[in-house]
């Protein structure tokens, strides 16, 4: 991953569009599979189909992701809302996952938000296999934002909504996991003396 190209492109007078991609990775212990779902909202690039980024296909899927902004004094807890009308429907995926861990509702699944610029997308996305915005670069992206599904907020016929959290902001996770004592770390308490 290289952030230099995207930060230099974003500062240009006429930067290309920011493309937002998502991966949802299931945990075998919690969900009974390690399936990776890749999708995009389809709102950043004028396309009704998939987007190919770094050799991976991201399917167009109605999704709304909000709340990624960092605020003073607290970590973001974004909300991911996904259409329940697709094929397969999110409810069907939840039923499969809940057979392994009842009532799990994808809790603990890893969600990665990937953002790049249109000029760095694979040439396969464009007619003639040529990117009209620039040279494809599968390593040029903003820093990835990694979250885990903390809880399902709502589910109905139309949408399913989850609250995401950073790994150390999940329920039941304490930091530090290892207690620092003088017997394990002899230099504790010696600073400033």
Question: Can you annotate each of these PLM segments?
Answer:
Residues 120-141:
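Active-site-adjacent substructure of cysteine-protease-like catalytic cores
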Residues 66-122:
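Extracellular/virion structural assembly segments
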Residues 5-9, 157, 177-193:
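Ubiquitin-like/PB1-type beta-grasp interaction modules and other compact soluble beta-rich domains
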Residues 156-180:
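Short solvent-exposed strand/turn elements
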Residues 54, 136-148:
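Short coil-to-beta-strand transition motifs
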Residues 1-60:
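Polar/acidic, low-complexity leader/linker segments enriched in S/T/G and N/D
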Residues 151-154:
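Residue-level recognition of beta-strand microenvironments
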């Amino acid at each position: 991953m290289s952030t230099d190209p995207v930060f230099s492109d974003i500062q240009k007078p006429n930067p290309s569009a920011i493309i937002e991609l998502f991966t949802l990775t299931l945990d075998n212990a919690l969900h009974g599979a390690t399936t990776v779902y890749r999708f995009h909202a389809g709102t950043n690039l004028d396309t009704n189909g998939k987007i190919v980024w770094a050799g991976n296909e991201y399917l167009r899927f109605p999704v709304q992701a909000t709340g990624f902004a960092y605020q003073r004094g607290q970590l973001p807890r974004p909300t991911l809302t996904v259409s329940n009308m697709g094929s397969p429907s999110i409810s069907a995926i939840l039923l499969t996952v809940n057979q392994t861990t009842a009532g799990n509702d994808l809790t603990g699944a890893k969600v990665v938000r990937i953002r790049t610029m249109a000029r760095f997308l694979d040439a396969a996305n464009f007619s003639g296999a040529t990117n009209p915005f620039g040279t494809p670069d599968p390593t040029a992206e903003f820093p990835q934002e990694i979250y885990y599904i903390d809880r399902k907020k709502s589910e109905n016929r139309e949408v399913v909504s989850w609250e995401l959290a950073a790994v150390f902001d999940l329920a039941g996770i304490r930091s530090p996991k290892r207690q620092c004592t003088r017997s394990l770390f002899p230099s504790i308490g010696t600073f400033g003396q």
